[in-house]
Amino acid sequence: MSNVTVCVRFRPLSHKERKTNGDKVCFKRLDSESFVFKDEREEDVIFSFDRVFYEDAEQSDVYNFLAVPIVADAISGINGTIITYGQTGAGKTYSMEGPSILHCNKQKTGLVQRVVDELFQSLQSSESMAMWSVKLSMVEIYLEKVRDLLDLSKDNLQIKESKTQGIYISGATEVSIQNSSDALECLSEGIANRAVGETQMNLASSRSHCLYIFSVQQGSTSDERVRGGKIILVDLAGSEKVEKTGAEGRVLDEAKTINKSLSVLGNVVNALTTGKPNHVPYRDSKLTRILQDALGGNSRAALLCCCSPSASNAPESLSTVRFGTRTKLIKTTPKSISPEVDSIKKPIPDSHGQNDLRDRILNKLRLSLKEEDVDLLEELFVQEGIIFDPNYSVADIDSACQDAASQEVSLLTQAVEELKETVEELTDENERLRGELELAQEAAAAAAAARADGALLGFVPAVAISSLLRPFGFVPD
């Protein structure tokens, strides 16, 4: 068991904060792990964390303490998650991405760029791993829908769970990346697609929770082992007070959804730290469902609580550090996860074992499929040279097949939902056109009646009548 690593970062005072409150701050520095903060009753409270980063801390300080151990574990096959949390405008996205994902000096680069560099440096320098691969996915949770930032046509992805993968986002685009440059270009594309908006507290406020997902897989030179790890970086949207942000309209709706999901996150943390693990409301929001493994499963986790140092934001900063204090009590059980069976296609000397496993799989499939379908699959296995590792059981491969089927069903479900929306739009358009047609028919009937009475030409020019009725297929003689 291990605790979630929790750090607090105070950003420098902004120009607006200095103009309003001068250099007054809401905390008193003690050391690298503790500070004093006044609560609602103006009483001094000492808060302690794994590390406190004050205004003069560098981006590299945050990365070296918070992220380096998680990257090392991911390369060793243990999943890791890093979450930035805090009030809107507190520096979460700056800590995660820096001022720009592509164009900023080395000193200011954020956690994302540094994780990418560390991953490829470690993998390329490893002598024990003969082969490796890194895949990148990037999604956002916007208005409680999971959207693929690398393929905007996928705007309602489903969250699934399996024995081999744990919690995963079904159908999310996975891009194979070969080096840091490829990764940053891909990340830049995803960031450009992210939902942002302007508020009184932040000119480029994130309106969604963003997840950067790096999947690492390696094969050993000494044996046939293949191990995989995953790093998930989570840039949460900030909690907001409407009276401070001035949100209205759609921005207000976004704020309500953001605050609700963060409230559920707080409920999950409370449930995990108050001795009621059987009643953890992971499914109450998309965010907590995705973070289920990080907070209560087999992943190593770290939390960076970002705070404004200004006295004007003291209530929000106090709420943030209290959330960090509760999160620090969570215990997880990090362990290595085997990669998906269907991703392992490497030569294995024991052909007898391969054939035996293939036959057992086909026999199992015969229980649920037609005989002719199984025969076609057998031909496909032989023609395509699909290899089965005898080290994996039928149950393992069956689980992997079920995962693949679940992903396909998710994509089909999404397509059906999109078709339903299209049908609804066409139905509305059809009703509108039907109404216009009825009006045109009434106008044509009235015109015919007026003409019969010899009164039409006395008050409406014939040209005007022709122009009015021509779009509907009625042209007066």
Swiss-Prot record:
Which GO MF term does the entry hold, naming one? plus-end-directed microtubule motor activity
Disulfide cross-links: none
Q: Which terms does the UniProt entry file under GO BP?
A: cytoskeleton-dependent intracellular transport; microtubule-based movement
What does the record say mutating R289H does? Diminished microtubule-stimulated ATPase activity, abnormal chromosome congression and segregation and reduced spikelet fertility caused jointly by reduced pollen viability and defective anther dehiscence
Checking InterPro entries in the record gives: Kinesin-like_fam (IPR027640), Kinesin_motor_CS (IPR019821), Kinesin_motor_dom (IPR001752), Kinesin_motor_dom_sf (IPR036961), P-loop_NTPase (IPR027417)
Q: Which residues form the Kinesin motor domain?
A: 3-330
Keyword Nucleotide-binding attached: yes
Location (main, coarse): cytoplasm
Please name one Pfam family that this protein belongs to: Kinesin
UniProt: ATP binding residues:
G86, Q87, T88, G89, A90, G91, K92, T93
Q: Coiled-coil regions in this chain?
A: 402-451
- Cellular component GO terms held in the UniProt record: cytoplasm; kinesin complex; microtubule
Origin: domain of life: Eukaryota
Q: State its location(s).
A: Cytoplasm
Sorted alphabetically, the keyword list is: ATP-binding, Coiled coil, Cytoplasm, Microtubule, Motor protein, Nucleotide-binding
Is the Cytoplasm keyword given for this protein?
Answer: yes
Which organs or tissues contain this protein?
Widely expressed. Expressed in young roots and leaves, in mature roots, culm, sheath and leaves, and in panicles at various developmental stages. Strongest expression is detected in panicles. In the panicle, expression is detected in anthers, glumme, lemma and palea. In the spikelet, expression is detected in both microsporocyte and the anther walls.
Q: What does this protein do?
A: Kinesin-like motor protein that exhibits microtubule-stimulated ATPase activity. Plays an essential role in male meiotic chromosomal dynamics, male gametogenesis and anther dehiscence. May play a minor and nonessential role in regulating meiotic spindle formation.
Question: PANTHER family of this UniProt entry?
Answer: CENTROMERE PROTEIN E (PTHR47968), KINESIN-LIKE PROTEIN (PTHR47968:SF17)
Family indicated by similarity: Belongs to the TRAFAC class myosin-kinesin ATPase superfamily. Kinesin family. KIN-1 subfamily.
Q: What is this protein called?
A: Kinesin-like protein KIN-1
Query: What is the organism field in this record?
Result: Oryza sativa subsp. japonica (Rice)
What gene name is listed for this protein?
KIN1
